[in-house]
Amino acid sequence: MGEQSRYLPECPEKGEVVRKLTEEYGGHVIFSRESEVYVEVPRHALKNVAKYLYSSGAFLKTCAAVDERPLNRSFALYHIFGMDSKGYDVIVKVSAPEDDAWVPSIVDVVPAADWCELEARDMIGIELRGRRLVRRLVLPEDWPEDIHPLRKDIPHNFRPPSVKAKSEFRPPERGIPIGPYHPVLHEPEYFELLVEGETVVDAYYRGFHIHRGIEKLGESPRFTYQKIPFLAERICGICGFVHSTCAIMAMEKAAGIRAPERAEFIRSIVLELERIHSHLLWVGVAAHVLGYDAGFMHTWRIREPVMILSELVTGSRKTYGLNLVGGVRRDINKDKIEKIVKTLDKLEKEFKELANLLVSVPQIRKRAQGTGVLTRSEARALSVVGPVARASGLYRDIRKDYPYLAYKEASFKIPLYTEGDNLARVLVRVEEVFESINIIRQLLDKLPGGPIMHEKCSAIIPVDELIPPGKYAVAAAEAPRGEDVHFLMTGEGRPYRWKVRAPTYQNIPALRPMLRGDPLADAPLTIASIDPCFSCTDRALVIDVKTGRARTIKLWNGGVGTCQL
């Protein structure tokens, strides 16, 4: 087992799961390590396998479609199930021959599979049988039907011919929607809210207008393994470090190496700094949405020293440039430790006073309490992550479930609420700020000595030569918005397939049950409550289901970094 045995202890229950999948469902193990087991099952058994894993407590993290025709003349769909309570993942592979490219849908037994199945259809061209037909998820309506961008015969710089677009929405009888394409929008996003009077009865979302093809770029000749961290940290303007950390952990697993302990501590410290500044940003935005601009300004004032700390530790306010395969570029010396501790002491005191004030403001409690409710069963069905899950009573946090990096050396609690409303999501994030401060203090106190780069990762041995082809790895880290997941299938000198699942991708489908039955006036806060990772969702189209009349409402100003992959 070597270096890999340091990732997670072997789980005795995993053997029973593997036995069930192989003996009862006709599967076979294609790869295994302590934290992961990959099992290929026949197409006809997929739905029963998914039902068994789901009923055993698994959450569907995502599914990754892969064009394996150059390897075995077939397509494949990898379903990543997380056995969170046991601390390991079961990756279920199902293959589809290129001349019969279909797999059964599992969305009726695992609703969380909805988006990733549609993405597999759009990007690879796999037919999902047994589910209702819906419009495209990722590709625009004027994209040619027979071109699927993540197939290996489509180059990364391919420009498709234009075709006549199909109309997505019936035109309203009256009203002119502004968005998703409008000069006043920082980035285009589209919400369609159906209302009766002033009550929301249903909601639809159309995103991916600025899909950047990052996964395709990562597989292209332009990017080697050494360049992937640079690309990964640009997935999101807020969660850049957690994305680069996830990508790097996957590559380190595939290479059979692990960063030195000191480097892991430094990564964990930066991840918590990132969580603090992200949560403070969100709390300020929430105060603004609720009409309490004094709270917005004070929260962002308190946040600014955290940005200065980020620059002190990483060299960049956006935490870019620190991560490398095998370690980190910069160390933390005694002077930096003193500055971090002093800044966090002041931050803790100021934010405690502000947080007590915020949650006591009558208009905040009245607007946030009892609105945007997501029940525990709904959260479970959709496999939501992060503060959204924990506010609905789901005890999900990768730092506890799959203790990675230095988190096993820190003692901290996971804020948990059962109300599932907007106020609960506010309180989870407020408490997490204090927990992150506590984690950083502990890690600084326990910061070990030693190198910050693995001995194999040097100029003498290029990183691209350390990662052999044909390996699999799944890496996950707890981003501010929830679990971030990267799936890696290695190729020659670069990824064969690199799948990224940002937390907002998992949480946006939950907005539909959260918005239903609530007053239209509360929709902006409910949408903001998941901390959606796209820049400036400024507009929503509102349609009265009785009259057909449409109008456009403004959601909020400002914005955060995009996670449109």
Write out the residue ranges for each language-model feature.
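Terminal low-complexity/charged segments
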Residues: M1-A203, S278, T343, I364-T371, ...
